Amino acid sequence: MTSNAELFSAAQAVIPGGVDSPVRAYGSVGGVPRFIEKAQGPWIWDAEGTRYVDLVCTWGPALLGHARPEVVSAVQVAASKGLSFGAPTRTETELADAIIERMAPVEKVRFVSTGTEATMTAVRLARGATGRDVIVKFAGNYHGHSDVLLAAAGSGVATAGLPGSAGVPAASTADTIVVDYNDVAALDAVFSERGDQIAAVIVESCPANMGVVPPEPGFNAAIRRLTTEHGALMITDEVLTGFRCSPSGFWGLQQQAGEDFAPDIFTFGKVVGGGMPLAALGGHADVMDLLAPTGPVYQAGTLSGNPLATVAGVKTLQLADAEVYQRLDVRSEKWRNELESALDAAGVTYRLQNAGNLFSVFLGVDSPVRNYDNAKSQNAEAYTAFFHAMLDAGVNLPPSCFEAWFLSDAHDDEAFEVFRAALPRAAQAAAQVISA
Protein backbone atom coordinates (compact mmCIF):
# COMPACT_ATOMS: atom_id res chain seq x y z
CA MET A 1 0.00 0.00 0.00
CA THR A 2 1.63 3.20 -1.18
CA SER A 3 -1.21 5.51 -2.20
CA ASN A 4 -3.27 7.70 0.08
CA ALA A 5 -6.42 6.03 -1.25
CA GLU A 6 -5.14 2.54 -0.45
CA LEU A 7 -4.08 3.58 3.03
CA PHE A 8 -7.43 5.25 3.67
CA SER A 9 -9.31 2.16 2.53
CA ALA A 10 -7.22 -0.04 4.81
CA ALA A 11 -7.73 2.33 7.72
CA GLN A 12 -11.50 2.41 7.19
CA ALA A 13 -11.57 -1.37 7.56
CA VAL A 14 -10.22 -1.24 11.11
CA ILE A 15 -10.72 2.34 12.38
CA PRO A 16 -14.17 4.03 12.42
CA GLY A 17 -14.18 6.38 9.45
CA GLY A 18 -10.51 5.60 8.91
CA VAL A 19 -9.39 8.35 11.30
CA ASP A 20 -8.99 9.01 15.01
CA SER A 21 -10.41 12.54 14.91
CA PRO A 22 -13.35 13.25 12.56
CA VAL A 23 -12.10 16.36 10.74
CA ARG A 24 -9.17 14.37 9.35
CA ALA A 25 -11.53 12.29 7.20
CA TYR A 26 -12.15 15.20 4.76
CA GLY A 27 -15.87 14.74 5.36
CA SER A 28 -16.76 18.37 4.72
CA VAL A 29 -14.43 18.92 1.75
CA GLY A 30 -14.55 15.50 0.12
CA GLY A 31 -11.71 13.55 -1.39
CA VAL A 32 -9.05 11.30 0.08
CA PRO A 33 -7.17 12.39 3.21
CA ARG A 34 -3.42 12.72 2.88
CA PHE A 35 -1.59 10.12 4.97
CA ILE A 36 1.48 11.88 6.30
CA GLU A 37 4.83 10.11 6.38
CA LYS A 38 7.06 12.87 7.72
CA ALA A 39 7.25 16.57 8.50
CA GLN A 40 10.10 19.06 8.73
CA GLY A 41 9.96 22.80 9.27
CA PRO A 42 7.00 24.20 7.28
CA TRP A 43 6.67 21.07 5.13
CA ILE A 44 4.82 17.76 5.28
CA TRP A 45 5.13 14.78 2.92
CA ASP A 46 2.35 12.31 2.23
CA ALA A 47 2.58 8.58 1.53
CA GLU A 48 2.96 9.25 -2.20
CA GLY A 49 5.97 11.49 -1.62
CA THR A 50 4.16 14.75 -2.37
CA ARG A 51 5.40 17.75 -0.40
CA TYR A 52 3.05 20.41 0.96
CA VAL A 53 3.40 23.72 2.75
CA ASP A 54 1.58 23.01 6.00
CA LEU A 55 -0.86 25.59 7.38
CA VAL A 56 -2.38 23.13 9.85
CA CYS A 57 0.76 22.75 11.98
CA THR A 58 -0.74 19.84 13.95
CA TRP A 59 -3.73 22.14 14.65
CA GLY A 60 -1.46 24.57 16.44
CA PRO A 61 1.31 22.85 18.42
CA ALA A 62 4.02 23.24 15.76
CA LEU A 63 4.78 26.83 16.76
CA LEU A 64 8.47 26.39 15.98
CA GLY A 65 7.90 24.27 12.89
CA HIS A 66 7.81 20.51 12.54
CA ALA A 67 10.60 18.43 14.06
CA ARG A 68 12.54 21.37 15.48
CA PRO A 69 15.95 19.75 16.10
CA GLU A 70 16.37 21.02 19.67
CA VAL A 71 12.94 19.69 20.67
CA VAL A 72 13.46 16.34 18.94
CA SER A 73 16.86 15.96 20.60
CA ALA A 74 15.44 16.73 24.05
CA VAL A 75 12.70 14.13 23.57
CA GLN A 76 15.19 11.54 22.32
CA VAL A 77 17.38 12.03 25.39
CA ALA A 78 14.35 11.74 27.66
CA ALA A 79 13.09 8.63 25.86
CA SER A 80 16.45 6.93 26.33
CA LYS A 81 15.88 7.18 30.08
CA GLY A 82 12.39 5.68 30.01
CA LEU A 83 9.07 6.53 28.39
CA SER A 84 6.94 6.97 31.49
CA PHE A 85 7.31 6.36 35.20
CA GLY A 86 3.95 6.94 36.86
CA ALA A 87 5.84 9.09 39.35
CA PRO A 88 6.82 12.76 39.69
CA THR A 89 9.65 14.15 37.55
CA ARG A 90 11.54 17.42 37.74
CA THR A 91 10.42 18.50 34.26
CA GLU A 92 6.82 18.76 35.49
CA THR A 93 7.91 21.46 37.91
CA GLU A 94 10.08 23.14 35.26
CA LEU A 95 7.15 23.33 32.84
CA ALA A 96 4.78 24.57 35.54
CA ASP A 97 7.30 27.30 36.40
CA ALA A 98 7.53 28.30 32.72
CA ILE A 99 3.74 28.62 32.48
CA ILE A 100 3.48 30.62 35.69
CA GLU A 101 6.22 32.96 34.50
CA ARG A 102 4.22 33.78 31.35
CA MET A 103 0.71 33.84 32.84
CA ALA A 104 0.50 36.28 35.76
CA PRO A 105 -2.85 35.06 37.18
CA VAL A 106 -1.63 31.45 37.34
CA GLU A 107 -0.14 30.38 40.67
CA LYS A 108 -0.38 26.59 40.37
CA VAL A 109 -0.68 24.14 37.46
CA ARG A 110 -2.01 20.60 37.02
CA PHE A 111 -0.99 18.59 33.96
CA VAL A 112 -3.23 16.22 32.02
CA SER A 113 -2.89 14.59 28.61
CA THR A 114 -5.55 16.28 26.46
CA GLY A 115 -7.41 19.56 26.14
CA THR A 116 -10.67 17.71 26.79
CA GLU A 117 -9.31 16.51 30.13
CA ALA A 118 -8.20 20.04 30.98
CA THR A 119 -11.59 21.64 30.36
CA MET A 120 -13.47 18.73 31.91
CA THR A 121 -11.36 19.03 35.06
CA ALA A 122 -11.72 22.81 35.10
CA VAL A 123 -15.52 22.46 35.09
CA ARG A 124 -15.40 19.89 37.89
CA LEU A 125 -13.07 22.13 39.85
CA ALA A 126 -15.37 25.14 39.43
CA ARG A 127 -18.33 23.12 40.62
CA GLY A 128 -16.36 21.86 43.58
CA ALA A 129 -15.16 25.34 44.46
CA THR A 130 -18.60 26.96 44.33
CA GLY A 131 -20.93 24.14 45.34
CA ARG A 132 -23.02 25.00 42.26
CA ASP A 133 -23.87 22.99 39.15
CA VAL A 134 -24.71 25.32 36.25
CA ILE A 135 -22.09 26.00 33.57
CA VAL A 136 -22.47 28.73 30.96
CA LYS A 137 -20.77 28.36 27.58
CA PHE A 138 -21.04 30.16 24.26
CA ALA A 139 -22.37 28.88 20.95
CA GLY A 140 -19.53 27.94 18.61
CA ASN A 141 -16.93 27.76 21.37
CA TYR A 142 -15.26 24.34 21.44
CA HIS A 143 -13.92 22.93 24.69
CA GLY A 144 -13.24 19.32 23.79
CA HIS A 145 -15.64 16.40 23.70
CA SER A 146 -16.73 15.95 27.31
CA ASP A 147 -20.50 15.51 27.57
CA VAL A 148 -21.23 18.69 29.49
CA LEU A 149 -19.50 20.95 26.93
CA LEU A 150 -20.58 19.46 23.59
CA ALA A 151 -23.73 21.58 23.35
CA ALA A 152 -23.59 23.97 20.35
CA ALA A 153 -19.85 23.37 20.01
CA GLY A 154 -17.46 24.41 17.26
CA SER A 155 -14.58 22.48 15.66
CA GLY A 156 -15.50 18.99 14.41
CA VAL A 157 -19.06 19.33 15.69
CA ALA A 158 -19.49 22.45 13.55
CA THR A 159 -17.74 20.82 10.60
CA ALA A 160 -20.18 17.91 10.71
CA GLY A 161 -23.14 20.27 11.08
CA LEU A 162 -24.22 18.64 14.33
CA PRO A 163 -26.00 20.29 17.29
CA GLY A 164 -24.10 18.09 19.71
CA SER A 165 -23.47 14.35 19.86
CA ALA A 166 -25.46 11.16 20.05
CA GLY A 167 -24.82 9.31 23.28
CA VAL A 168 -24.90 12.42 25.45
CA PRO A 169 -27.80 12.06 27.91
CA ALA A 170 -30.05 15.06 28.32
CA ALA A 171 -29.14 15.02 31.99
CA SER A 172 -25.49 15.66 31.12
CA THR A 173 -26.29 19.01 29.54
CA ALA A 174 -29.27 19.93 31.71
CA ASP A 175 -27.02 22.24 33.72
CA THR A 176 -25.30 23.71 30.66
CA ILE A 177 -26.61 27.05 29.42
CA VAL A 178 -25.57 28.16 25.93
CA VAL A 179 -25.42 31.89 25.18
CA ASP A 180 -24.70 33.65 21.90
CA TYR A 181 -21.05 34.66 21.70
CA ASN A 182 -20.17 38.35 22.00
CA ASP A 183 -23.61 39.11 23.50
CA VAL A 184 -23.08 40.74 26.89
CA ALA A 185 -26.78 41.55 27.27
CA ALA A 186 -27.73 37.88 26.85
CA LEU A 187 -25.14 36.82 29.40
CA ASP A 188 -26.32 39.51 31.81
CA ALA A 189 -29.88 38.20 31.46
CA VAL A 190 -28.78 34.65 32.31
CA PHE A 191 -27.02 35.88 35.44
CA SER A 192 -30.03 37.98 36.42
CA GLU A 193 -32.20 34.86 36.28
CA ARG A 194 -29.86 32.14 37.57
CA GLY A 195 -26.79 33.87 38.96
CA ASP A 196 -26.90 32.06 42.31
CA GLN A 197 -26.81 28.67 40.51
CA ILE A 198 -23.94 29.33 38.10
CA ALA A 199 -20.63 27.68 38.97
CA ALA A 200 -18.65 29.08 36.05
CA VAL A 201 -18.62 30.65 32.63
CA ILE A 202 -16.22 28.93 30.24
CA VAL A 203 -15.07 30.78 27.14
CA GLU A 204 -12.41 30.40 24.49
CA SER A 205 -10.07 33.32 25.04
CA CYS A 206 -10.50 33.95 21.32
CA PRO A 207 -12.66 31.38 19.57
CA ALA A 208 -10.82 29.67 16.73
CA ASN A 209 -12.94 26.57 16.27
CA MET A 210 -15.72 28.28 14.32
CA GLY A 211 -13.09 30.16 12.39
CA VAL A 212 -11.26 32.94 14.17
CA VAL A 213 -13.89 35.13 15.86
CA PRO A 214 -12.24 37.64 18.22
CA PRO A 215 -14.11 38.88 21.27
CA GLU A 216 -15.43 42.39 20.91
CA PRO A 217 -13.64 44.96 23.09
CA GLY A 218 -14.69 44.50 26.70
CA PHE A 219 -16.47 41.17 26.19
CA ASN A 220 -14.09 38.97 28.19
CA ALA A 221 -13.80 41.68 30.84
CA ALA A 222 -17.60 41.70 31.09
CA ILE A 223 -17.55 37.96 31.75
CA ARG A 224 -15.07 38.59 34.54
CA ARG A 225 -17.27 41.34 36.01
CA LEU A 226 -20.46 39.27 35.95
CA THR A 227 -18.86 36.14 37.39
CA THR A 228 -17.29 38.13 40.20
CA GLU A 229 -20.56 39.89 41.01
CA HIS A 230 -22.41 36.57 41.29
CA GLY A 231 -19.75 34.45 42.99
CA ALA A 232 -19.06 32.30 39.94
CA LEU A 233 -15.70 31.43 38.39
CA MET A 234 -14.36 32.42 34.98
CA ILE A 235 -12.66 29.65 33.01
CA THR A 236 -10.63 30.90 30.05
CA ASP A 237 -9.85 28.20 27.50
CA GLU A 238 -6.45 28.84 25.93
CA VAL A 239 -5.92 25.28 24.73
CA LEU A 240 -5.54 26.58 21.18
CA THR A 241 -4.44 30.19 21.71
CA GLY A 242 -2.19 29.69 24.73
CA PHE A 243 1.48 30.43 23.94
CA ARG A 244 0.45 30.61 20.27
CA CYS A 245 -0.92 34.17 19.85
CA SER A 246 1.74 35.69 22.10
CA PRO A 247 4.09 34.58 24.91
CA SER A 248 1.01 34.85 27.16
CA GLY A 249 -1.59 33.67 24.67
CA PHE A 250 -4.59 35.71 23.61
CA TRP A 251 -5.03 36.81 27.23
CA GLY A 252 -1.63 38.48 26.88
CA LEU A 253 -2.74 40.34 23.76
CA GLN A 254 -5.77 41.64 25.62
CA GLN A 255 -3.59 42.80 28.49
CA GLN A 256 -1.43 44.69 26.01
CA ALA A 257 -4.59 46.31 24.63
CA GLY A 258 -5.53 47.57 28.09
CA GLU A 259 -8.17 44.98 29.01
CA ASP A 260 -7.08 44.18 32.54
CA PHE A 261 -8.85 41.11 33.91
CA ALA A 262 -7.75 37.84 35.47
CA PRO A 263 -9.68 34.57 35.02
CA ASP A 264 -9.86 32.11 37.91
CA ILE A 265 -8.82 29.12 35.79
CA PHE A 266 -6.98 28.83 32.47
CA THR A 267 -6.77 25.70 30.35
CA PHE A 268 -3.79 25.09 28.06
CA GLY A 269 -2.84 22.54 25.42
CA LYS A 270 -1.24 22.15 21.99
CA VAL A 271 1.85 24.44 22.12
CA VAL A 272 2.44 23.74 25.81
CA GLY A 273 3.26 20.11 24.98
CA GLY A 274 5.56 20.94 22.09
CA GLY A 275 3.72 18.51 19.83
CA MET A 276 3.41 15.74 22.41
CA PRO A 277 0.14 14.76 24.18
CA LEU A 278 -0.05 17.23 27.06
CA ALA A 279 -2.48 19.81 28.41
CA ALA A 280 -2.88 21.69 31.66
CA LEU A 281 -5.11 23.79 33.83
CA GLY A 282 -3.83 26.55 36.05
CA GLY A 283 -5.14 29.28 38.26
CA HIS A 284 -5.25 30.85 41.68
CA ALA A 285 -3.68 28.70 44.39
CA ASP A 286 -6.81 28.70 46.57
CA VAL A 287 -8.80 27.21 43.68
CA MET A 288 -6.14 24.82 42.40
CA ASP A 289 -5.47 23.42 45.88
CA LEU A 290 -9.01 22.03 45.86
CA LEU A 291 -7.71 19.33 43.50
CA ALA A 292 -6.73 15.99 45.04
CA PRO A 293 -4.59 15.16 46.93
CA THR A 294 -4.80 18.51 48.76
CA GLY A 295 -8.53 18.94 48.20
CA PRO A 296 -11.78 17.06 47.56
CA VAL A 297 -11.98 17.49 43.75
CA TYR A 298 -10.64 14.32 42.17
CA GLN A 299 -8.49 14.16 39.05
CA ALA A 300 -5.89 11.59 38.04
CA GLY A 301 -4.16 10.13 35.00
CA THR A 302 -1.56 7.45 34.36
CA LEU A 303 0.26 9.53 31.74
CA SER A 304 -0.48 12.98 33.17
CA GLY A 305 2.71 15.03 33.10
CA ASN A 306 4.63 12.25 31.35
CA PRO A 307 8.35 12.98 30.93
CA LEU A 308 8.48 13.03 27.12
CA ALA A 309 5.70 15.60 26.85
CA THR A 310 6.95 17.81 29.65
CA VAL A 311 10.48 17.81 28.21
CA ALA A 312 9.07 18.79 24.80
CA GLY A 313 7.01 21.53 26.45
CA VAL A 314 9.92 22.93 28.43
CA LYS A 315 12.20 23.05 25.39
CA THR A 316 9.48 24.61 23.21
CA LEU A 317 8.77 27.41 25.68
CA GLN A 318 12.50 28.01 26.14
CA LEU A 319 12.90 28.49 22.39
CA ALA A 320 9.69 30.50 21.92
CA ASP A 321 11.08 33.85 23.00
CA ALA A 322 9.68 37.29 22.21
CA GLU A 323 11.52 37.41 18.87
CA VAL A 324 9.72 34.27 17.69
CA TYR A 325 6.34 35.91 18.23
CA GLN A 326 7.49 39.14 16.59
CA ARG A 327 8.60 37.21 13.51
CA LEU A 328 5.34 35.27 13.45
CA ASP A 329 3.24 38.43 13.63
CA VAL A 330 5.13 39.98 10.70
CA ARG A 331 4.95 36.75 8.72
CA SER A 332 1.25 36.26 9.39
CA GLU A 333 0.48 39.78 8.17
CA LYS A 334 2.47 39.16 4.98
CA TRP A 335 0.64 35.90 4.26
CA ARG A 336 -2.76 37.44 5.08
CA ASN A 337 -2.06 40.37 2.76
CA GLU A 338 -1.22 38.00 -0.07
CA LEU A 339 -4.42 36.05 0.55
CA GLU A 340 -6.47 39.25 0.53
CA SER A 341 -4.85 40.41 -2.71
CA ALA A 342 -5.69 37.16 -4.48
CA LEU A 343 -9.29 37.12 -3.26
CA ASP A 344 -9.76 40.78 -4.20
CA ALA A 345 -8.35 40.18 -7.67
CA ALA A 346 -10.78 37.31 -8.19
CA GLY A 347 -13.73 39.39 -6.98
CA VAL A 348 -14.44 37.10 -4.04
CA THR A 349 -16.60 38.35 -1.20
CA TYR A 350 -14.89 37.37 2.04
CA ARG A 351 -14.01 38.29 5.59
CA LEU A 352 -10.48 37.63 6.87
CA GLN A 353 -10.11 37.68 10.65
CA ASN A 354 -7.12 37.13 12.90
CA ALA A 355 -6.02 36.85 16.50
CA GLY A 356 -2.35 37.70 16.53
CA ASN A 357 -0.72 35.28 14.09
CA LEU A 358 -3.83 33.04 13.91
CA PHE A 359 -6.23 33.71 11.05
CA SER A 360 -9.04 32.28 8.97
CA VAL A 361 -11.12 33.35 5.99
CA PHE A 362 -14.91 33.31 5.71
CA LEU A 363 -15.84 33.08 2.03
CA GLY A 364 -19.06 34.63 0.79
CA VAL A 365 -19.33 36.87 3.87
CA ASP A 366 -19.12 40.66 3.60
CA SER A 367 -19.49 41.78 7.23
CA PRO A 368 -17.66 41.03 10.48
CA VAL A 369 -18.15 37.53 11.85
CA ARG A 370 -18.92 37.99 15.54
CA ASN A 371 -20.79 34.82 16.52
CA TYR A 372 -21.62 31.25 15.53
CA ASP A 373 -24.61 32.16 13.35
CA ASN A 374 -22.42 34.57 11.38
CA ALA A 375 -19.76 31.87 10.98
CA LYS A 376 -22.30 29.36 9.69
CA SER A 377 -23.39 31.80 6.99
CA GLN A 378 -20.12 31.38 5.06
CA ASN A 379 -20.07 29.53 1.75
CA ALA A 380 -18.71 26.09 2.64
CA GLU A 381 -18.80 24.93 -0.99
CA ALA A 382 -16.58 27.84 -1.98
CA TYR A 383 -14.11 26.84 0.73
CA THR A 384 -14.12 23.27 -0.59
CA ALA A 385 -13.17 24.50 -4.06
CA PHE A 386 -10.51 26.78 -2.59
CA PHE A 387 -9.14 24.00 -0.36
CA HIS A 388 -8.69 21.49 -3.19
CA ALA A 389 -7.11 24.03 -5.52
CA MET A 390 -4.58 24.88 -2.83
CA LEU A 391 -3.97 21.21 -2.03
CA ASP A 392 -3.38 20.40 -5.70
CA ALA A 393 -0.81 23.23 -5.76
CA GLY A 394 1.05 21.93 -2.72
CA VAL A 395 -0.56 23.81 0.18
CA ASN A 396 -2.17 21.93 3.06
CA LEU A 397 -5.03 23.91 4.62
CA PRO A 398 -7.45 22.80 7.35
CA PRO A 399 -10.03 20.48 5.73
CA SER A 400 -12.85 22.51 7.26
CA CYS A 401 -14.00 26.11 6.87
CA PHE A 402 -14.49 26.30 10.65
CA GLU A 403 -10.83 25.96 11.61
CA ALA A 404 -7.98 28.42 12.06
CA TRP A 405 -4.91 28.57 9.83
CA PHE A 406 -1.50 28.29 11.47
CA LEU A 407 2.00 29.44 10.60
CA SER A 408 5.23 28.59 12.37
CA ASP A 409 8.63 30.12 12.96
CA ALA A 410 9.88 27.84 10.18
CA HIS A 411 7.61 29.14 7.40
CA ASP A 412 10.27 30.72 5.20
CA ASP A 413 10.38 32.50 1.84
CA GLU A 414 10.33 29.23 -0.11
CA ALA A 415 7.13 28.18 1.65
CA PHE A 416 5.62 31.61 1.04
CA GLU A 417 6.32 31.43 -2.69
CA VAL A 418 4.48 28.10 -2.94
CA PHE A 419 1.56 29.65 -1.06
CA ARG A 420 1.60 32.80 -3.19
CA ALA A 421 1.70 30.88 -6.47
CA ALA A 422 -1.25 28.69 -5.46
CA LEU A 423 -3.58 31.53 -4.50
CA PRO A 424 -4.82 32.96 -7.85
CA ARG A 425 -6.24 29.67 -9.14
CA ALA A 426 -7.74 28.84 -5.74
CA ALA A 427 -9.35 32.27 -5.48
CA GLN A 428 -10.84 31.87 -8.96
CA ALA A 429 -12.23 28.46 -7.98
CA ALA A 430 -13.93 30.01 -4.95
CA ALA A 431 -15.26 32.90 -7.04
CA GLN A 432 -16.86 30.52 -9.53
CA VAL A 433 -18.75 28.74 -6.76
CA ILE A 434 -19.93 31.96 -5.14
CA SER A 435 -21.14 33.42 -8.44
CA ALA A 436 -22.87 30.22 -9.60
Swiss-Prot record:
One of its GO terms (molecular function) is pyridoxal phosphate binding. Transmembrane segments: none annotated. It comes from the Bacteria. Its cofactor is pyridoxal 5'-phosphate. The keyword Magnesium does not apply. Signal peptide: none annotated. GO terms for biological process: protoporphyrinogen IX biosynthetic process. Gene3D superfamilies: Aspartate Aminotransferase, domain 1, Type I PLP-dependent aspartate aminotransferase-like (Major domain). The keyword Isomerase applies. GO terms for cellular component: cytoplasm. Belongs to the class-III pyridoxal-phosphate-dependent aminotransferase family. HemL subfamily. Homodimer. This is Glutamate-1-semialdehyde 2,1-aminomutase. The gene is hemL.
